[in-house]
């Protein structure tokens, strides 16, 4: 699970300005952290289908944010993809 300290660390790394918690980069980074955690969770809990639905919703939300960022500012999109190591 993501602790408050880990969340603050991610926000500080990806924020665009002081106090920024809602920019697409921050939201994508936080979703990626939660997706990574759940992916590891499913390696040991294969039959946890309720959480799998939540994972699929998060992946879809992250995809929508990435598409938005790609349309708005392609350079920021490429930077977040490379920083997080995502395939696109």
Swiss-Prot record:
Record's keyword annotation contains Phosphoprotein: no
Alphabetized GO MF terms: rRNA binding; structural constituent of ribosome
Key words of the record: Ribonucleoprotein, Ribosomal protein, RNA-binding, rRNA-binding
Pfam families (alphabetical): Ribosomal_S15
One Gene Ontology term from the biological process aspect of the record: translation
Classification via PANTHER family: RIBOSOMAL PROTEIN S15, BACTERIAL AND ORGANELLAR, SMALL RIBOSOMAL SUBUNIT PROTEIN US15M
Record's subunit section: Part of the 30S ribosomal subunit. Forms a bridge to the 50S subunit in the 70S ribosome, contacting the 23S rRNA.
NCBIfam families associated with the record: S15_bact
Similarity field: Belongs to the universal ribosomal protein uS15 family.
Described purpose of this protein according to its UniProt entry: One of the primary rRNA binding proteins, it binds directly to 16S rRNA where it helps nucleate assembly of the platform of the 30S subunit by binding and bridging several RNA helices of the 16S rRNA. Forms an intersubunit bridge (bridge B4) with the 23S rRNA of the 50S subunit in the ribosome.
Identification of the protein by name: Small ribosomal subunit protein uS15
């Amino acid at each position: 699970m993501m602790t408050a300290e880990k969340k603050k660390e991610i926000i500080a790394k990806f924020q665009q300005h002081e106090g920024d918690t809602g920019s697409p980069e921050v939201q994508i980074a936080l979703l990626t952290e939660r997706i990574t955690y759940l992916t590891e969770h499913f390696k040991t809990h294969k039959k946890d289908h309720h959480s799998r639905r939540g994972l699929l919703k998060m992946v879809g939300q992250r995809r929508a944010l990435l598409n938005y960022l790609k349309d708005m500012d392609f350079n920021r999109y490429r930077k977040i993809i490379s920083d997080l190591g995502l395939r696109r």
